[in-house]
């Protein structure tokens, strides 16, 4: 084949440190817009960014020229600086270590988009921990429940 054709859809999820509710609904769009800009600068295409006060979901078209851990590190580091430098939170903002990432086929993009778009409604009845366990189980990812949000000793 004379050219390279790639379409990889990824769904990233990561939490505020200690799952604190630091992303106010008032600042949410500003923070998500900054994240989208960062993704574009890194040559990825954000499709939707959503979440609630204690975590974020990102659906993107991923450019494999950048390693996933590097993408997440740059996104978290840049967003943390943006939030703290612009005093978008009352307290010092930090992301929790780690993240979850799931891949989806093109046929599932609309469903994942709607899922992320409806995070506020979705979390009226489900915690982030419940949501993440459900996603991990759905993808057959093995995990130790006690370490989902805490560091192994």
Task: Give the positions of each predicted feature.
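Basic nucleic-acid-binding interfaces
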Residues: 1-153
């Amino acid at each position: 084949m004379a050219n390279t054709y790639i379409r990889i859809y990824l769904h990233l999820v990561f939490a505020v440190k200690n799952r604190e509710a630091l992303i106010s609904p008032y600042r949410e769009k500003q923070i998500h817009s900054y994240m989208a800009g960062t993704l574009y600068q890194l040559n990825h295409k954000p499709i939707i960014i959503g979440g609630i006060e204690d975590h974020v979901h990102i659906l993107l078209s991923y450019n494999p020229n950048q390693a996933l851990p590097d993408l997440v590190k740059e996104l978290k580091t840049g967003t943390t600086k943006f939030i703290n430098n612009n005093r978008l939170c009352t307290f010092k903002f930090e992301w929790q270590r780690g993240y979850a990432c799931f891949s989806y086929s093109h046929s599932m993009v609309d469903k994942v988009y709607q899922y992320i778009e409806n995070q506020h409604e979705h979390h009226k009845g489900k915690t982030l921990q419940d949501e993440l366990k459900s996603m991990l189980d759905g993808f057959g990812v093995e995990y130790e429940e006690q370490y989902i949000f805490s560091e192994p000793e």
